[in-house]
């Protein structure tokens, strides 16, 4: 198996249905979009009605719609998540992008599951595990190089997805707790404060300013 043996598919993020339509009209093969809840961007949610109207539009152009449910769930959110997955399945979406492995234990309809980049997929072993438990597509950690991507691709039957444009976190995907430690807002709950992108002043052990108001983490 080689990288060139498969047709490349171009995916685009979309904050809302209007942006999703434009992405499809401009050539995206698939769009991933937040649903009513449990997405990693809590300010980019869309109603079931919006998604239900978007799906036939996408399919008319041969494109797919993936919905993100890629946050870590609390125990009391498992049943609501299960209901939401059933509702999304009924809208006709093509797949769900998830992070929490607890979803595998839920009684859900036969919908494709994609492993989010928040799953921190950096090794062949993790990629094989996710493929073996039923994920049909895995979104690799953004920190990998081409050699690492190739090794994972050759070791698993799952479709490989990789980010080629956009913001790059300074931490490993899904493993950053700066926001939660500093503000109580968790990146794994869709509420990152993006503390790494703020300017900081660095001082040495004598209190002398080494760098003033610079973006030291990003």
Which residues fall in each region the model found?
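Active-site pocket-lining/capping segments in soluble small-molecule metabolic enzymes
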Residues: 2-121, 153-218
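Internal, well-ordered domain-core segments that constitute the primary functional module
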Residues: 115, 119-160
């Amino acid at each position: 198996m080689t990288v060139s043996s498969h047709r490349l598919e171009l995916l685009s993020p979309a904050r809302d249905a209007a942006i999703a339509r434009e992405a499809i009209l401009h050539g995206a093969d698939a769009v991933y979009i937040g649903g009513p809840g449990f997405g990693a961007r809590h300010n980019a949610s869309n109603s079931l009605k919006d998604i239900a109207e978007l799906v036939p539009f996408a399919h008319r152009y041969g494109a797919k719609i993936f919905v993100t449910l890629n946050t870590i769930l609390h125990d009391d959110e498992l049943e609501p998540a299960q209901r939401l997955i059933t509702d999304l399945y009924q809208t006709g979406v093509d797949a769900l992008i998830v992070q929490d492995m607890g979803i595998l234990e839920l009684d859900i309809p036969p919908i494709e599951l994609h492993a989010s980049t928040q799953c921190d997929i950096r090794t062949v072993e993790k990629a094989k595990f996710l493929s073996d438990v039923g994920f049909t597509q895995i979104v690799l950690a953004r920190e990998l190089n081409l050699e690492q991507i190739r090794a994972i691709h050759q070791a698993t039957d799952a479709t490989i997805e990789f980010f080629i444009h956009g913001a790059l976190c300074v931490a490993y995907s899904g493993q950053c707790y700066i926001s939660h430690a500093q503000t109580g807002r968790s990146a794994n709950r869709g509420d990152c404060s993006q503390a790494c992108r703020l300017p900081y002043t660095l001082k040495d052990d004598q209190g002398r300013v080494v760098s003033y108001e610079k973006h030291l983490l990003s």
